[in-house]
Amino acid sequence: DETLILVTGDHETGGLGIGYKTTNYDTFLTNLAHQKMSYAKFDSTYVNNYVKNRTPFETAMQDVKANFGLTLPTDPDAANAGKLLLTDHEVENLRTAYERTLKVGSSSQSKMSQQDYELYGTYIPFSMAICHTINHKSGVDHTTYAHTGAMVNLYARGQGADKFRGVYD
């Protein structure tokens, strides 16, 4: 009866927004079911080898299709790709990010152009471009690569819990 348990987070991360301009703010969240792994796992499983072996972009995109569902217009299964069929603009964005990955990889903010930092943060450009693309095709976006100013929940259980429940800045 004397125990009080408090659970909270120190910050919210990512700033998830529902609705995206290129989908007219509609959502297609089932697209996200095609993502089979995190960007970090994709980096360690695939991208590190692409860099080492100088893998051609089209070959890398076969792994992107298998792990994220994003499909090139030239793919034999393009007619079945639905909302995950890439536009020419998206292909060029992915190609640019891929070439930057092979040439430079990730970098600190001080060593990047403002444009590259806004596009990729300090992460591997190709993986970030993949994630941005599937997010945007799904109708979601993230406002930051880091902490946000959003308030966090505080959960409480036990003696005096009613004094601690809520959302706090």
Predicted regions and their residues:
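A post-motif C-terminal structural segment
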Residues: D1-D169
